[in-house]
């Protein structure tokens, strides 16, 4: 087991060095990533710059789709984060989690925009049964995610560690802090105490924040692309009704109605 771990560690550091070299080459050719002036301090280093470069090149098409999707739900989600005391930049954590798709699901059975596992979702008040899965409700799942993120921040005392804990779980991050003796995420990245996925997760989120702050400057012409329509009115239904009947009364297609209510 020790020999296998050493091989894995060696492979990680080789890959990390390769990534750092690519990021450095990109920085030399393209110039430094512009400073970010938002509410959450954004560190720009070789790890972040690697993902900036990736999203502008190999991952460009995917990131463009995320940006377009984000135009439709950002007005719904960001005010909820702000009102909950969570930095607006955490909107882009959801982008990395799911591509901002409420229908996203993982092999681990995480679901929705914020990729909640069933147990965590229920712990934070989301309803899951035969008829509804509120992990796919962009408003309710955002409120639950904001509550969870605030608890992680209050527990760990740092927003970067809260991001890492959202990915790895708070227990693993607390253990990494205890074993390493450091609460600096970037110093934890230099140890074996965090998984490679978590070490890359926070830089991905930060890269998304930087690119989305001024997408046109990075060649993403988001406003020229039509964003999907999102309903902004809530109507209470007082008795059971078939969705196709309700869609007919509203004068919309069943597909549109389901798109407005992805939790159903």
Predicted regions and their residues:
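Export/targeting segments at the very N-terminus of extracytoplasmic proteins
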Residues: 59-99, 143-152, 235
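Short, functionally critical alpha-helical segments immediately adjacent to catalytic or ligand/cofactor-binding
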Residues: 86-103, 162-169, 257-261
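Solvent-exposed loop/turn segments at secondary-structure junctions
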Residues: 98-101, 120-123, 169-172, 212, ...
